[in-house]
């Protein structure tokens, strides 16, 4: 064990812990209330001889590190975070993507748009002001001495300096949370503003880097885009966000002026996110065929695991595989036609009306957020009865087209949950 001067406890806790834990591999010591104590513990790979000499050496090295931290902290505090931000004009974000200062300008627009989307138009002026301010200051700590020396403290020092500058706690916390999750399994943003800034930062990084043709291949991912994309996916899932991936990409494309590449960018990002979602589903133990069934549409990211869980529950239910067969039967016919408006006046058999009613009941249950399994089981029975009693390809062209349109409408609705043709049946 060893100790250091109490004066260093005036530094932000992470500024003391980081050089101690990450650089020297020492264990910090905390009081019962969680406050940091001026002491540390180390592990020696050897005997007990000369432990006092070893401890003294450890203390000397740590004091030098803490003295550096104190110096950088004092120098950094000679300017406000807003003043530090000006230096971002000289820091390149990425080749071809301008400066970090320009990035913060984009983040101001992106974060504000996300906050407005999350609030569904019920955002007050204070929340929007916080969104702009958090994004404006989000990268300012990157040019401070403390973060230059201890890069692990990015965002953390931004939070501390923002608080010392008198910024709102919401702004300060968001500056820290923008980098979450910092590693696999780490904490996700817990505040709405932190979520918004983090999502904005990640989608800006992904779209910007992709626009320069720097899409990760194989084991090469120099900009950590896979980790950021996975973080974005996990955030959207945890928040049960109704935010669409395509809307995020559109916002980023607007800010990068990528109009002619917009459609391609949507495809690239969706494919990239799809792979991250596949990883998430695999880790949750979702069957591989169920994964394929639900990953066709990943626009509403948070809904993908929900749909996967539903399909697995459907398969596990009594008659589940037969139900899937019924759904697949509809798709086998419907996907080769364009479909049109269904006219009940053209129904010739009562099974047609029964099928329409069963479909409407299932659609209504879904719209109301009810458990749709009972109504979809009823729909499956109606489908089987329909095919047993009705010849779809009627001699009357209008009747035939009406029946095909009915099947097309049902299949389109089922596809919103899953492509059941991907399911492997016993």
Mark where each language-model region is.
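Amphipathic alpha-helical "coupling" segments that flank catalytic cores
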Residues: 1-426
């Amino acid at each position: 064990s060893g100790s250091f001067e109490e004066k260093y406890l005036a530094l932000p806790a992470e500024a003391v812990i980081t050089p101690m834990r990450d650089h020297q591999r020492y264990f910090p010591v905390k009081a019962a209330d969680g406050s940091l104590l001026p002491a540390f513990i180390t592990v020696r790979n050897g005997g007990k001889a000369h432990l006092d000499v070893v401890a003294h050496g450890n203390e000397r090295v740590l004091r030098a590190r803490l003295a550096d931290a104190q110096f950088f902290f004092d120098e950094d505090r000679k300017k406000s975070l807003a003043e530090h931000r000006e230096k971002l004009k000289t820091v390149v974000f990425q080749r071809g993507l301008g400066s970090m200062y320009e990035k913060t300008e984009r983040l101001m627009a992106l974060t504000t748009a996300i906050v407005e989307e999350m609030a569904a138009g019920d955002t007050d002026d204070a929340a929007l002001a916080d969104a702009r301010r958090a994004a404006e200051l989000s990268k300012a700590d990157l040019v401070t001495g403390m973060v230059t020396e201890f890069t692990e403290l990015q965002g953390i020092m931004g939070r501390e300096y923002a608080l010392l500058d008198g910024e709102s706690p919401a702004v300060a916390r968001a500056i820290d949370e923008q980098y979450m999750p910092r590693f696999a399994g780490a904490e996700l943003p817990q505040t709405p503003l932190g979520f918004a800034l983090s999502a904005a930062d990640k989608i800006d990084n992904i779209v910007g880097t992709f626009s320069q043709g720097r899409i990760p291949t194989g084991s090469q991912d120099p900009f950590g885009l896979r980790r950021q994309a996975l973080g974005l996916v996990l955030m959207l899932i945890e928040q049960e966000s109704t935010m669409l991936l395509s809307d995020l990409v559109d916002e980023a494309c607007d800010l990068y002026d990528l109009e002619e590449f917009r459609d391609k960018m949507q495809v690239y990002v969706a494919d990239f996110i799809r792979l991250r979602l596949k990883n998430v589903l695999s880790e949750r133990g979702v069957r591989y065929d169920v994964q394929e069934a639900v990953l066709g549409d990943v626009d509403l990211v948070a809904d993908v695991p929900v749909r996967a869980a539903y399909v697995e529950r459907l398969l596990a239910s009594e008659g589940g595989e037969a139900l899937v067969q019924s759904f697949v039967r509809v798709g086998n016919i419907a996907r080769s036609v364009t479909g049109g408006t269904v006219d009940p006046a053209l129904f010739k058999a009562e099974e047609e009306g029964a099928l329409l009613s069963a479909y409407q009941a299932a659609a209504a249950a879904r719209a109301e957020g009810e458990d749709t399994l009972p109504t979809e089981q009823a729909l499956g029975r109606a489908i089987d009865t329909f095919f047993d009693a009705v010849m779809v390809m009627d001699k009357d062209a209008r009747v035939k087209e009406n029946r095909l349109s009915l099947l097309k409408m049902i299949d389109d609705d089922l596809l919103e949950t899953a492509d059941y043709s991907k399911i492997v049946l016993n």
